[in-house]
Amino acid sequence: MLNLIVVVLPILAAVTWVVFNIQKPAREQLARQFDENNKAF
């Protein structure tokens, strides 16, 4: 059981880190797009 946790935890941390790093720039780009749309109106 402990062995499983030792293996799964770093994988889970890596996946979470990758997802967070991908979402961060995407969210900034989305916010920029909304700002441009608001200025257009």
UniProtKB/Swiss-Prot annotation:
Task: Give the primary localization class.
Answer: membrane
Keyword Thylakoid carried by entry: yes
Keywords assigned: Membrane, Photosynthesis, Photosystem II, Thylakoid, Transmembrane, Transmembrane helix
Please name the GO terms that the record assigns under molecular function.
manganese ion binding
- Single GO biological process annotation from the record: photosynthesis
> Has UniProt tagged this entry with the keyword Transmembrane helix?
yes
- Give the GO cellular component terms, alphabetically: photosystem II; plasma membrane-derived thylakoid membrane
What is the membrane topology noted in the UniProt record heading this document?
Single-pass membrane protein
Q: What subcellular compartments does it reside in?
A: Cellular thylakoid membrane
Q: Name one Pfam family in it.
A: PsbY
Q: Where are the transmembrane segments?
A: 4-22
Tell me the subunit arrangement.
PSII is composed of 1 copy each of membrane proteins PsbA, PsbB, PsbC, PsbD, PsbE, PsbF, PsbH, PsbI, PsbJ, PsbK, PsbL, PsbM, PsbT, PsbX, PsbY, Psb30/Ycf12, peripheral proteins PsbO, CyanoQ (PsbQ), PsbU, PsbV and a large number of cofactors. It forms dimeric complexes.
Per the entry, what this protein does is:
Loosely associated component of the core of photosystem II (PSII), it is not always seen in crystals. PSII is a light-driven water plastoquinone oxidoreductase, using light energy to abstract electrons from H(2)O, generating a proton gradient subsequently used for ATP formation.
Q: Which family is this protein grouped under?
A: Belongs to the PsbY family.
Per its record, how is this protein called by name? Photosystem II reaction center protein Y
Mind giving the lineage of the organism this protein is from? Bacteria, Bacillati, Cyanobacteriota, Cyanophyceae, Synechococcales
